[in-house]
Amino acid sequence: MKMNKNHKTVLVILNIIVSFLISSCSSPKEQVRIGNGTFTIEGKDIQLICGEMHYPRIPHEYWRDRLKRARAMGLNTVSAYVFWNFHERQPGEFDFSGQADIAEFIRTAQEEGLYVILRPGPYVCAEWDFGGYPSWLLKEKDMTYRSKDPRFLSYCERYIKELGKQLSPLTINNGGNIIMVQVENEYGSYAADKGYLAAIRDMIKEAGFNVPLFTCDGGGQVEAGHTEGALPTLNGVFGEDIFKVIDKYQKGGPYFVAEFYPAWFDEWGRRHSSVAYERPAEQLDWMLSHGVSVSMYMFHGGTNFEYTNGANTGGGYQPQPTSYDYNAPLGEWGNCYPKYHAFREVIQKYLPAGTVLPEVPADNPTTTFATVELKESAPLRSAFHQTTQSENVLSMEDLGVDFGYIHYQTTLQKAGKQKLVIQDLRDYAVILIDGKQVASLDRRYNQNSVTLNVSKTPATLEILVENTGRVNYGPDILFNRKGITSQVLWGNEKLTGWSITPLPLYKEKVSEMEFGETIKGVPAFHKGTFTVEKKGDCFVDMSQWGKGAVWVNGKSLGRFWNIGPQQTLYLPAPWLKEGENEIVVFEMEDTGKRVLQGLNQPILDSLGIDKNYQKGQRRAVVGTPILEDGDLALKTTLQETNEWQSFDLPVATTLRHFCIETLASYTEDNQACISEVELIDDKGQPIDKTKWEVVYVSSEQADKNLGIAENLFDGDISSFWHTNAAVESNHPHRVIIDLKEIYKVSAFRVKVRKGSFLSGKVKDINIYGRPLSTKYIQ
């Protein structure tokens, strides 16, 4: 067909238009930019006022409720970790439905006028089991996590690719509301492998996340944790340090504190973390007034339903409870603490002119139910589905189990009084002989043996082991297998011939068990019913029980433990029925009491009797603390005097953990002895010592508490910390103290023990400070 000149001109123009349209579709408009010291979103400069909240820790039915409360407090952004092990519980099998539908959570945030900062890890910490890693990674015993191990990176890539399919369409450049994506998480507190960081960064880009990337680290760890092409941000840093640190890597900012801590998380057996609102509100005010973008960790903590809590090992093995209330502005059940209203007042001062915040939604209704007694029981074996025969013990990971419990059974052939040793117990064990419970062992106290008297043989030995939470922070994430991870000895004999049954009870259909007469004194399930007239949030009071887990209408509320501080379990209103409701309790440590009730307020700060604690016993610390040059706050020499000595820090330091390291003594015995220490805040005031807690001590004179590390801050100058004189040791000696709150410290005061002829008169010391937990190496 012959074409004239006009036809050709029209075709050329059409081709240009089509090419432009294709180009426009394939290259979305850049809606978020970082430059000139600011964040620019949709053409406008913005100060990010952000809060962290986690979709698995909030009932799906309450996502919108919590997001509305975030917007009403003044937040313009929410930050959210993505939990790998919540989506890929078995290799290659992904779940993004229901409670795991993070895309719906993000779209709901957009509908409520909130941007989203995505934190996909793959490692996330978050006081979550294994820091978000799936437990099946542990099957490959020689694989190294958070490294360039090719096998590990291949699993990371599969996960991130799948995440990209689900979430990359929701970036702001694709019409959604995801404005930034984080690369890894606090990596500088773990290692400094730039190749590994670059690999994770590139995976995120290749997965389609076409928005700015960032890293987050403590102030002294940015060098190790930062990667090219990602904005460096800070965790736990306050004041002028924000500018000093960031300017080393990105002169002029923008400045973003990706984790600002209004409070802290809890652990089993310790008091509930509670921080008054005044100081955090002042810190928030300072940051906003100085143009710093900020994300509060947490804005709303929520709940570790099922068995998802993690554990730390900084001060011994420290598992976290079911409640992740965090003493955040918005409490576990969506309640507004005074901190919420104080923060709202601060934020309102910095909103654009004419901006009116939404009204704070009314409190959600609560309900109660009367005391009920659970009279029906089912034996532990009701949950036995698949038993494996093995010559040697196997771990939970060997059997493909992520959470819950594992049951071991064998036969004892030798009678008499012998020591039963469970090597590398992870984490809590109940021991039965011929069906009778005879002992329990607790990893928190490094308990791994008990002496038993077996009068008749053969005798049946049963060991029920609970995974109370995989380590989520520090080098110990490499040692996270659960159950019995080595061997069991009876006297000097290694026990063999095991029947092993995994019990991942969080997905157990407890309602279908056959219940009958009550069972006492051994692990068992107990069932009852209660009635509510109207649905409302409720708190199941488990303070009369020992240790176990609860289901209501088939929904797993998580675990309880009467040592506290948590004594209630949160029961969300959507999981209740008007009228009769079924409750099932698994009791691992039976108290003989079968009563419970529903309250309209939680009990989060009530310590009970810890049956495994022995007087004078300190939590078993695993490893040696790593002290980094970036955390060194003061290096000085003490005078040979008994008077108080004061030292200004060269630079005021933001810290929560601080370490006293002795390097030399005036005496020649290599001992160390100090009577009392004080820290002075940035306003020149002594910091309250009533909440301080020792999390590590390299040596102490523990006999009759004569020279324990707690004497350093007991307010009594006649008491003292003294290294163990009965054990030969050299400097350095170290004590690490948790202040339980982040402070800006300007000075250090110390008083050595009074007396002329005393051992351990300290001469040279270092003081280290970290806003985050101390890390350790084995």
What do the predicted segments below correspond to?
Residues 156-182, 193-194, 201, 209-210, ...:
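Carbohydrate-binding surfaces of carbohydrate-active enzymes
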Residues 463-469, 585-591, 661-668, 753:
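Short beta-strand-plus-loop segments that form exposed binding edges in beta-rich domains
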Residues 418-432, 461, 530-553, 560-561, ...:
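Aromatic-lined ligand-binding clefts that engage carbohydrates, nucleic acids, or primary amines
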Residues 413-419, 532-539, 652-657, 730-732, ...:
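Extended extracellular/luminal ectodomain segments enriched in beta-structured repeat modules
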Residues 62-83, 101, 112-117:
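Catalytic domains of carbohydrate-active enzymes, especially glycoside hydrolases
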Residues 386-391, 553, 619-655, 666-745, ...:
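Disordered, acidic Ser/Thr/Pro-rich linker "stalks" and the adjacent N-terminal cap
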Residues 30, 34-62, 68-72, 93, ...:
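Extended substrate-binding grooves/exosites of carbohydrate-active enzymes
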Residues 119-121, 172-185, 203-224, 230-236, ...:
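Aromatic-lined carbohydrate-recognition surfaces of secreted/lumenal glycan-active proteins
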